[in-house]
Amino acid sequence: MLASGVVYFLETHVSWSSIAASCALVCIVSACYVVWSLLHVPYDQGIPAVGIPKGILGRAKAVYDSIAHGDVPIAEGYRSVSSEPFKAATEALTVAQWQHNKSGQIFRVPSLMDSFSFVYVIPSPLIPQYNAAPEERVSFTSGLEHLDLTPYTLLSHRFTQSPLHLGALRSTLSGGREVEVLADEVATSFTTSWKFPSQWTTIPNLYYSLLDIITRDVNRAYVGAEFCRNRDYIETIIDFTPEVVRCRTILRLIPGFLRPIVSPYVLRHNRARRDKIHSILGDEIKKRKSMLGSKDSSKPTDLLQALIVEANKSPQSTAESDPKMLVTRLLALNFVGNRTASVAFTHAIWSLLHCESQGLGYWNAMREEVENIFASDDSDEINESKKHYQAQGARWMRWNKTHTAQMGLVESFLKESLRYNTDTNLECKRMIVDPEGYRFKNGMNLKRGTVSAVPIWQIHHDPDLYPEPEDFDARRFLQGDGGAQGRKVGMQTTSEYFLAFGVGKHACPGRFFASQHLKLLLAFILLNYDIQPVSRPEDEWYGSSHMPNMAAGLTIRARQD
C-alpha cells in the first residue's frame, strides 16, 4: 500500500524532469563519496595498513586489486605483520603453542566490504578474546548490518534484530530427525535432475545443477515436499540470492544517508520475488496458523511450522506472525544456506575428481565405506526402503543419524575440503560498538565503528596447524591421523583453527543440518554414479569470496559395476 501510494504521488505531483534531476544528484553525490573514499587513507596510530601501493592513487588501486585478488594483502599481512619467526615448520605444535608463537599484531586491509574503508584483521592469539567479547562491545549483529546491509538486502531489520529463526532452526534441524527427510529428497532431486544415463553424459554447469538440487533438498526440510517440488517456488528462491549480492554491491557505493531513499528502487526485483513466494505459501501459512494450539498429530514438523510457533510466542507476535514476514525469514535463510552449501559441495566434487586424476584412490575408498553402511542394515524397514528406491532406479535407503555417523572417511574428506577450499578469506566479522572502543590483552585498541574479521584462509593454510597445508589429504581429520592435537573428525566441530562454520556463540546454527546434507549428497553420488576424473578447473576470487569455477561441466553415467 505504501509503495503504491508513493508511486501514485510521484505520478500525479512530480514531473519526470524533477525525478531525472534527483537521480542525477544521487549519482553525483555517490560518485563524490566513492572518489573521496578511495583517495582518503585515514591514519590509525599503531595499526599498519597492508596492501596499499605508494602514491595518491594507491588506495584506489588497492581497492581495485581486492576485487580479483582480495586474498593477497591478507596473506601478506598474516605472513609479515601478525607472525613472528616460527619454530621448525615440521614440528607439530599444540594450539596453545601456535597461538603463543604469533605476535598478536592487528593489521588492516582495504576492502569493498566496508564501502571502501578498512577491515581490521584479528590475528590468531587474539581470537579467543575476540569471540568471547560481549555483544554490547564487539557486535556480530552490527557487523552483519553494516557489512552486508541486511536491513536492506534481506528486506527487513527483524532478521538480525529479532533472530527468532535461531530457535526454529534448533528445534527442527539439529536433532537428527531431518536426516530421513533430507535423504528422501536427495534421491528424488538427483533422480529428477541428473537421472541415470547409461552413456557418458555431461552436466553442463556443475555449480548451478547442484544449486538447484540443494535448494530443493533444503526446502523439503523448510516447507515440505509439495512446495520444494514446485518449480516456480524453487526458481524464485534461486533467483533471490544473486540479486541480494547485486543489491548489496550497489548500496555499498551509495552514502548511508541516501540508502533509505534509493533502496526501494534497488530492491524492487527481490521485493517482487518475496511477493511471489507469499502468493505460493500464503494459504498454507494461514492454514497452519489456524492449527496453532491443536493436538493434531498430522501437523507439519518442518521449519516453516517452527517459525510460525516461534513468531506466535514473540513479544511482537503481530508483526512476526505476518505471512509476509514469515516469507521474508524463509528467503533470508535460503540465501544464507543454499549458496554456501552449493559452493562447498562444488569445491568438494572438483577436489575429489582432481585427486582421482592423481591416482589417490579416495573415490573407491569412500564408495566402499558407504557400501558397507548400506549393506550392513538389513532390517525389514530398511529393506523395504531399498526396494522403494530401487524401483526408481536408485541404489538408496532410508538413512538415519546412526548411518551417517558411520561415514568417517566421507566426513573427513568433506571437512578437509572445507579447510582446503575455504570459501572466503575473512570470517567472524564484527563491529566495535563500545563508545570507549575495545582493548585487547596485548594493549591494542580498536575504536568504535571499526569493522574486524579473522583471516580464515590463512589459518586454514597455516603449516604450523596443518602439516603440508597445500596438499589435499582426505584422511587428515580421521581420529589419530594428522593435524593439530585434540582435533575431532566432526565437520560441525568448531574451534579457533577450524572456522568453516565460525566459532563460539555466533557459530553457524545450521551447521549440523549442513554437515548431514553434504554427507548424504556425496553418499548418493558414490552409490549411483561413475564420474570421469578431471584436473580441477581454475577457481575464482571475487573480493573476499573464493568460488569454484562457475561454468565448468561434469561428465557422469549411471554406475556400471
Swiss-Prot record:
Pathway: Secondary metabolite biosynthesis. It is an enzyme of class 1 (oxidoreductase). Its cofactor is heme. It holds the Pfam family p450. Its EC number is 1.-.-.-. Disulfide bonds: none annotated. Keywords: Heme, Iron, Membrane, Metal-binding, Monooxygenase, Oxidoreductase, Transmembrane, Transmembrane helix. It is found in: Membrane. GO terms for biological process: secondary metabolic process. Belongs to the cytochrome P450 family. The chain crosses the membrane at residues 19-39. GO terms for molecular function: heme binding; iron ion binding; monooxygenase activity; oxidoreductase activity, acting on paired donors, with incorporation or reduction of molecular oxygen. This is Cytochrome P450 monooxygenase avaL. It is a single-pass membrane protein. Cytochrome P450 monooxygenase; part of the cluster that mediates the biosynthesis of a highly modified cyclo-arginine-tryptophan dipeptide (cRW). The first step of the pathway is perfornmed by the arginine-containing cyclodipeptide synthase (RCPDS) avaA that acts as the scaffold-generating enzyme and is responsible for formation of the cyclo-Arg-Trp (cRW) diketopiperazine. AvaB then acts as a multifunctional flavoenzyme that is responsible for generating the cyclo-Arg-formylkynurenine DKP, which can be deformylated by avaC. Its main location: membrane. GO terms for cellular component: membrane. Heme binds at C508.
